[in-house]
Amino acid sequence: MAEGGFTHNQQWIGPEEAEELLDFDIAVQMNEEGPLNPGVNPFRVPGITSQEKDDYCKILQTKLQELKNEVKEVKIEEGNAGKFRRARYLRYSDENVLSIVYLLIGYLRYLIDHRSLGSLRHDIDIETPQEEHYNNSEKGTTLNIKYGRRCCISTFIMYLILFAGVGIWLGARAQVVWRLPPLVVPVDDTEIIFWDCWAPEEPACQDFLGTMIYLKANVNISIQEGPTLGNWAREIWSTLFKKATRQCRRGRIWRRWNETITGPLGCANNTCYNISVVVPDYQCYVDRVDTWLQGKVNISLCLTGGKMLYNKETRQLSYCTDPLQIPLINYTFGPNQTCMWNTSLIKDSEIPKCGWWNQVAYYDTCKWEEANVTFQCHRTQSQSGSWIRTISSWKQRNRWEWRPDFESEKVKISLQCNSTKNLTFAMRSSSDYYDVQGAWIEFGCHRNKSKRHSEARFRIRCKWNEGNNISLIDTCGTNPNVTGANPVDCTMKANTMYNCSLQDSFTMKIEDLIVHFNMTKAVELYNIAGNWSCTSDLPKGWGYMNCNCTNGTDNSETKMACPKNQGILRNWYNPVAGLRQALIKYQVVKQPEYLIVPEEVMQYKFKQKRAAIHIMLALATVLSMAGAGTGATAIGMVTQYHQVLATHQQALEKITEALKINNLRLITLEHQVLVIGLRVEAIEKFLYTAFAMQELGCNQNQFFCKIPPSLWSMYNMTLNQTIWNHGNISLGNWYNQTRDLQNKFYEIIMDIEQNNVQGKTGIQQLQKWENWVGWIGKIPQYLKGLLGSVLGIGLGILLLLICLPTLVDCIRNCTNKILGYTVIAMPEIDDEEVHLSVELRRNGRQCGISEKEEE
């Protein structure tokens, strides 16, 4: 087709192909570093008709042909995808370019009119005698003075009118929007919070991070429904242990044990059996478990996505929490545990809603409850053992020391402990791997350093299965008719001494093996012999699951009923509840994108005493929370706030640099992918709103934007000056009061983006601009041609200068040969000798021979 000046080799580009080409154009521009040029695809505007698409094709046909050629030339692996960088730069710096052009034009005009302006001067010099003097009235006014005064007065009036016009224009009624105000506000309940875990070389992070999905954004961080209690806690306990000892499964972990078993006649007749067994090296596990049994893990939880944590106690902003001491306390469950957060999830009617088999009791409500209890234990020298003779280092002579018998059963009951509260615990038929049955309580107990004992921390277990028949199940009741039960009272009464023991062994399943770990030697190192006492060091926030116990409708006396006085306590660590307890002092906040402020903010003067926003900013009283006063409630936040913003910006820059250099190859971890996703989402949002912000008069480098009155009045956005009260209001309260205005401002942006007329106008303006600056894209070609010409001319001149003498001689010889002359060069002689004449010989003529003789 020849329409629009196309050649026969170019084909008309239709709407479908044009839509893909414009998408390519926008995608190419997104490959560059920001800020990006906003791109709008007119073919994707809602409600566009086929006729409008054809019109767009006619308008943009030239640009589409260029884009089509660009698609053919682009090779992503060569890194030449972005070819509009220069045009985008001029697009964003058009104001500066025009200012420079205007300045240049004005200066040239001055140079051109300089002589004509000088001709207006009429200098008249009147010679007067020196003895004569004239006053000012007698001197009069020369033309220079008269025209100079007129020029000054007219210039002053002109600038006065100009400044007055500018002041009137700037002072026109408009709404001020503060972009990225320096304050933080609480997040909405509907917003999604992305958490990350930070604990160097600590495998427990991933387990606790998995529970964070049940935390939602709220002023007081709350929890949602969770999985089954028993399965959840059991899985966490097993997973934490496996990860804590994962180093034991690397390298030389397995040892080979070779044994030869002989028969009655020795090895005759092939009666020997060679046995080779591969066993794990348990010493590695023992070393790590000894430390792990102390039961504390230091982790920090961090926020991503631009949100921050506000500490209500210290009034500081941070991205991560303080290190949380998560206790790895064991738990107590009954057999066949079925208790869930939401009992409606249990569909089987035969399964109790929350309880155990062979009992009529079930628990309808379980909630986390802080324990606020203290355990005290003491030990007296009463267990079996033996005295051995050893060398004393401090008396320099032999003495007898007591060594307890750790294999004795009495060692396990040699401790007496009590609690400060009545605690009724649930029972169970077995633990994870059949090491303990019944009901029990576990806690850490700290012993201070003394003269005879070193500082140590023990893990103590108190249980209630020391009956006549320990094979029966402790049911924590007094009904003897329960089948297979050993009725005991599972209530640990306050201020009552109970026999307890050190947890010196435990059983754990490692891969496919059930392994029993004997920690006797490790406990012996603590020097438990003698008399000593310890106090529980339960971390703050440690507690139980307190469940209300209700008897069912079954009146069978062979099933265990609920305790008489209170519900059942489950001694286990709930990650969600523990995190909730640790995070209760934090509040999730964010920095708003826009804040609607009165025009009074733009008219602020430093000497005024009213508390406008600038005064708050100048005094560094950035108010962060809703309801805070206008005083210095957040003075300490400012420094850290700027550090947080700087750190966040540096992180984004590093991630962007990693994207450009490694082409997404470094982004392998989940939290990095999450941050990248948020970054891409922010870029898309910026692309979507940049055009509307330009239409509203907001430059990306401006912090204050003034919205035209026409758009402002169209949406009925009026500010309540009574609430503002000349700035005597906190920023947090002002943000909450004007939240509806923020939403309306978003509506203005969305309407401008989706408005077909505005989009078409913007495209036409962009097309005109590209027509004006289209020659810029040809600059490299011009430079190549110019450089080639300069190099060619310079090389030609250089060759000419080098070869010029030879060329002159050649031309001279050729000329003489054509004319028939030969140059005879005579040798040089001294000045004193007689100068010999040099004659030319023509056609064989010789010197001294006449023509006649020659003939």
From Swiss-Prot:
Topological region Extracellular: 1-784
Cytoplasmic side: 806-855
Phylogenetic lineage: Viruses, Riboviria, Pararnavirae, Artverviricota, Revtraviricetes
One Gene Ontology molecular-function label: structural molecule activity
InterPro entries: Envelope_glycop_lentivirus, GP41-like
Site residues (Cleavage), renumbered to this chain: R610, A611
Annotated glycosylation sites: 135, 220, 258, 269, 274, 298, 330, 336, 342, 372, 418, 422, 448, 469, 481, 499, 518, 531, 548, 551, 716, 720, 728, 736
GO biological process: symbiont entry into host cell; virion attachment to host cell
One cellular component (GO) term of this entry: host cell plasma membrane
Region described as Fusion peptide: spans on this chain: 615-635
Superkingdom in the source lineage: Viruses
Post-translational events: Specific enzymatic cleavages in vivo yield mature proteins. Envelope glycoproteins are synthesized as an inactive precursor that is N-glycosylated and processed likely by host cell furin or by a furin-like protease in the Golgi to yield the mature SU and TM proteins. The cleavage site between SU and TM requires the minimal sequence [KR]-X-[KR]-R.
Subunit-structure text: The mature envelope protein (Env) consists of a trimer of SU-TM heterodimers attached by noncovalent interactions or by a labile interchain disulfide bond.
Keywords, ordered alphabetically: Cleavage on pair of basic residues, Coiled coil, Disulfide bond, Glycoprotein, Host cell membrane, Host membrane, Host-virus interaction, Membrane, Transmembrane, Transmembrane helix, Viral attachment to host cell, Viral envelope protein, Virion, Virus entry into host cell
Transmembrane region(s): 785-805
Entry function: The surface protein (SU) attaches the virus to the host cell by binding to its receptor. This interaction triggers the refolding of the transmembrane protein (TM) and is thought to activate its fusogenic potential by unmasking its fusion peptide. Fusion occurs at the host cell plasma membrane. The transmembrane protein (TM) acts as a class I viral fusion protein. Under the current model, the protein has at least 3 conformational states: pre-fusion native state, pre-hairpin intermediate state, and post-fusion hairpin state. During viral and target cell membrane fusion, the coiled coil regions (heptad repeats) assume a trimer-of-hairpins structure, positioning the fusion peptide in close proximity to the C-terminal region of the ectodomain. The formation of this structure appears to drive apposition and subsequent fusion of viral and target cell membranes.
Renumbered residue ranges of the record's region Immunosuppression: 661-679
Protein name per Swiss-Prot or TrEMBL: Envelope glycoprotein gp150
Coiled-coil intervals, chain numbering: 642-692, 735-771
Pfam family, one: Env-gp36
Keyword Transmembrane: yes
